[in-house]
């Protein structure tokens, strides 16, 4: 390739999942003149973690996920994380409603549907915790619509599939928020990509593998291989975003930026039990989360979810965790060993030493029999029959391993944005709550990598138009929260009666 034989873009985004799609469309909203390209290794968008069947949980808003509200040593409930995730999800809703209102999408029902969110516990300790959680959360305006019950008749209305077959004296309780949602991030991603592809100066190319990243005078020189015809090309980009899910870590290492030194990855795979039997599916219209078993990691929180994909309802139960050395579902078994570097070997060994309980848990999950999986399901749905459910492999998650001055290395659950000091390249690492808070994460990236533009009158005005209220305002101003949330729910058709709604009585 000749010295000058390269393409030039303002923005190069690696990975055609929800993160890159959101960032690209958001940047185009802020500056329509930007020239950008999205490159994706697979043959289409949203193949990996953004795919609805690979996504461990959707519509995360802190309403039902008990691991977001830990109990402190003094017995109090810490609601900070739940409030933070709730307001971030509201920011996502603002972006989606902005795009719906301007006609970017068709019906919002193609990607978001109303599904109540419930927390469900068994036993006196679980009930005491849930009641205290309810009392703590409902003091905040973001959770004021939450209701609590221990009444079996009420619970049968909320969870008609889950109540028959339980012992009459079983101590159970639940909270319910009617305004929860289910989000098909695969459909949302592909609609964002379709919209982006129609914009001047934007293109999306599939079957593209990034093989080299190196600094250039004005940004980065990136070598991309076409996996179908084998040809290489070079792209000169002022800014590069590595939004390739589990594949972001190897690309970050390839960049060589000092900010990426010391990071490692711990891959965790997932499996689900899936039910498509309409007679069963119609009896459950909810996402019901419970507590993880004592000593189990956060990704093990069991839940029984209504999923709406392409207009059809299914039920998913799990997740059952597993272990694979792949960083992507369509990745290589060499991903983990090839990610070991002199700079991250100590953190990775430290995590291996300090997380033997997690290792044992994952081995136990891998060794589970079908009967053991069914037994876990029956804690939610006592009358479950094996023939109505099938086991499906879900997507890969790569949890973050990072340096720690005391322990050498720690395993971090969540997401982390890693950016070069000059803002010319950024990578998103980690997993949950992931997709549900994509918009907030990408806004954070814009403020970090494009600080001057973000403060400019043009970008500031556009951001205020798209986002009438950001996270801190939503957290502190109850009236603003109510008005913005209500308007977004109306635009996204979350307040009207949904055609996928199931009956709630127990008969």
From Swiss-Prot:
Gene3D superfamilies: D-Amino Acid Oxidase, subunit A, domain 2, FAD/NAD(P)-binding domain. It is an enzyme of class 1 (oxidoreductase). The keyword Oxidoreductase applies. Keywords: FAD, Flavoprotein, Oxidoreductase, Tricarboxylic acid cycle. One of its GO terms (molecular function) is L-malate dehydrogenase (quinone) activity. GO terms for cellular component: cytoplasm. InterPro entries: FAD/NAD-bd_sf (IPR036188), MQO (IPR006231). Its EC number is 1.1.5.4. It catalyses: (S)-malate + a quinone = a quinol + oxaloacetate. Its cofactor is FAD. One of its GO terms (biological process) is tricarboxylic acid cycle. Pathway: Carbohydrate metabolism; tricarboxylic acid cycle; oxaloacetate from (S)-malate (quinone route): step 1/1. Pfam families: Mqo (PF06039). NCBIfam families: mal_quin_oxido, PRK05257.1-1, PRK05257.1-4, PRK05257.2-1, PRK05257.2-4, PRK05257.3-2, PRK05257.3-4, PRK13339.1. Belongs to the MQO family. This is Probable malate:quinone oxidoreductase 2. It comes from Pseudomonas aeruginosa (strain ATCC 15692 / DSM 22644 / CIP 104116 / JCM 14847 / LMG 12228 / 1C / PRS 101 / PAO1). The lineage of its organism: Bacteria, Pseudomonadati, Pseudomonadota, Gammaproteobacteria, Pseudomonadales.
